[in-house]
Amino acid sequence: MTNEFHHITVLLHETVDQLAVKPDGIYVDATLGGAGHSEYLLSQLGDEGHLYAFDQDQTAIDNAKKRLAPYVERGMVTFIKDNFRHLKSRLQEAGVEEIDGICYDLGVSSPQLDQRERGFSYKQDAPLDMRMNREAALTAFEVVNHYSYQDLVRIFFKYGEDKFSKQIARKIEQARSVKPIETTTELAEIIKSAKPAKELKKKGHPAKQIFQAIRIEVNDELGAADESIQQAIDLLAVDGRIAVITFHSLEDRLTKQLFKEASTVDVPKGLPFIPDELQPKLELVSRKPILPSKEELESNNRAHSAKLRVARKIHK
């Protein structure tokens, strides 16, 4: 097992630059990971500024403490080991009621994918795990071996958007009736066997969407993102900014919807004025998502599906 986090940060400058960092501001990196965004953000803060960095993976925090050592020594960064769905309560515990900016880099980090024993990847043989927080109870093994056929179909359709969800769930049900499905490669082979030959010729691994679905279920990724982004919008000071990087359509759809709800107002036309409590909280900084540059796409394969959405707080 390796404890080193080798991670190329996606949309690094675009994300932090869009936060319009104030040297004395209070900022949050909701997804510390390899600490790339945190490091660049901290480089723009003065001694009066502070960064709160969230991650539920102790390995990520341990590595970030080394990478960010100069800022740690100056007392400019606080690490919070928790799921970002507890953003508001954990910041309030730290005495923070308002923030000037926050960034999210959603999904699984590439170091987690690269650590074979974490069981995130269909490319490496490992026990079925997929927990971002290794202390959590629910694992991929539990989902694959104990969820009902109906529940498997539901999560495969909902989180994997795989049109062969029923066939795959049926194959899993058949396989586990003989013996438990214990490893990533076992599961990948079962998924492959459920798909027609012409489907296997298509670009991309046949197990990709199902592994994504199981990972999202194990970590409740969309539920956590939904709760956290709403809390972040409330915590932002007026003129504060929120930047969210997504890697698949479900994350992007969720972010787009939350930003839309907070930046539009649902009142009858012709109303002489909009009451304070109905004023939109956000303004979109960019109507369309910001995409990686040609140079970044050439140097970092993970960047291909990345989209960045940014909004600014305009009303408390």
From Swiss-Prot:
One annotated GO biological process: rRNA base methylation
Residue sites binding S-adenosyl-L-methionine per the record: 35-37, 55, 84, 105, 112
Keywords: Cytoplasm, Methyltransferase, rRNA processing, S-adenosyl-L-methionine, Transferase
Annotated GO CC locations: cytoplasm
InterPro entries: RsmH, SAM-dep_MeTrfase_MraW_recog, SAM-dependent_MTases_sf
Enzyme Commission (EC) number: 2.1.1.199
Any Pfam family: Methyltransf_5
UniProt-recorded name of the protein: Ribosomal RNA small subunit methyltransferase H
Organism in which the protein naturally occurs: Streptococcus sanguinis (strain SK36)
Gene: rsmH
